[in-house]
């Protein structure tokens, strides 16, 4: 009775990919950022139609929130998602941690617009925009995590 050596040998198995390929990471991030910008622009249009001024008091001088400001406001989300994806290559649980941190930062950032010296419509619209960007970050990281 002979023992098959191939059945008893131990082979090193390559570990599974920790995170999605970079192409997928970039696509998920860009799509989430673009979706956030479009939804925030819709919120801005709805707020303007409802009478929100989108004028904030910036140390005594008025600052008007424009459409380009909405685009620029998504850059922290893009950097955060890419950083979480990079860290997720090292440890997979960091993707989920990135989702939690992104969601919490969005919730905490709502305090800024709510405490701003401006009209109520502007406060509500800006707070909603902060939440939209947070949801986009969480969704992008979920798409990246599921692709892993």
Enumerate the language-model features and the residues they cover:
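Alpha-helical transmembrane segments of multipass membrane proteins
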Residues: 35-44, 80, 109, 133, ...
């Amino acid at each position: 009775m002979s023992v098959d050596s191939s059945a008893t040998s131990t082979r090193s198995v390559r570990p599974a990919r920790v995170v999605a390929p970079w192409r997928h990471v970039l696509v998920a991030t860009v799509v989430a950022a673009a979706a956030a910008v479009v939804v925030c622009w819709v919120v801005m249009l709805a707020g303007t139609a409802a009478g929100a001024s989108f004028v904030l008091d910036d140390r005594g001088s008025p600052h008007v929130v424009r459409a380009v400001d909405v685009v620029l406001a998504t850059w922290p989300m893009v950097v955060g998602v890419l950083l979480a994806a990079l860290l997720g290559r090292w440890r997979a649980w960091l993707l989920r941690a990135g989702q939690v941190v992104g969601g919490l930062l969005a919730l905490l950032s709502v305090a800024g617009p709510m405490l701003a010296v401006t009209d109520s419509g502007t406060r509500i619209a800006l707070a909603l925009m902060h939440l939209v960007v947070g949801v986009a970050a969480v969704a992008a990281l979920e798409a990246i995590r599921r692709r892993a």
